[in-house]
Amino acid sequence: MSIKSDKWIRRMAEQNGMIEPFEPGQVREAAGHKIISYGTSSYGYDIRCAPEFKVFTNIHSTVVDPKNFDEKSFVDMHGDYCIIPPNSFALARTVEYFRIPRNVLTICLGKSTYARCGIIVNVTPFEPEWEGYVTLEFSNTTPLPAKIYAGEGCAQVLFFESDEVCETSYKDRGGKYQGQRGVTLPKT
């Protein structure tokens, strides 16, 4: 299993629709202002956060249960940025839609710009033949409100190609998050 380069990522995105929309270079500026970078890097792809958020709240004092998740635990927000309360978290989704090849697994790591501010971005691996918009989890580990930005980079996806094709892919087993479109809450 080897990590894939910018050339491979570009080819797979442009010829096979692996990432849509796709940015072949690194974008570091928009409308004359510096932004948190996104697009193709040497050995990965920096994904962007879309302008739809679900911010965790304790207004209804429900129990957090991944097997029986109460949607009232979140407040929906839309905009160019989102403020996460202290010691809380928000869910978002990527701007990009992914189609992962059968012989590829990805690992996604939060960008250091956010990590250095106490904002942790968590994403599980994208499994072989998974496709959809990626649900992102932003944890504010600080005692202060934290700001995250839509349309800017938030995490980097690393692509690993196996030397053999898997026997059973995510699509084959009917994965519960296959084809997800918006910010997707826990499912069992």
From Swiss-Prot:
InterPro entries attached to this UniProt entry: dCTP_deaminase (IPR011962), dUTPase-like_sf (IPR036157), dUTPase_trimeric (IPR033704)
TM annotation in the entry: none
Binding site residues for dCTP: 111-116, 135-137, 156, 170, 180
CDD domains linked to this entry: trimeric_dUTPase
Gene Ontology annotations of biological process type: dUMP biosynthetic process; dUTP biosynthetic process; nucleobase-containing small molecule interconversion
Residues the record marks as active site: 137 (proton donor/acceptor)
UniProt GO molecular function: dCTP deaminase activity; nucleotide binding
Record field: catalytic activity: dCTP + H2O + H(+) = dUTP + NH4(+)
Enzyme kind, highest EC tier: hydrolase
Pfam families associated with the record: DCD
Keywords: Hydrolase, Nucleotide metabolism, Nucleotide-binding
Pathway assigned in UniProt: Pyrimidine metabolism; dUMP biosynthesis; dUMP from dCTP (dUTP route): step 1/2
E.C. numbers: 3.5.4.13
Family per record: Belongs to the dCTP deaminase family.
Function: Catalyzes the deamination of dCTP to dUTP.
Subunit structure: Homotrimer.
Annotated protein name in UniProt: dCTP deaminase
Organism listed in the record: Variovorax paradoxus (strain S110)
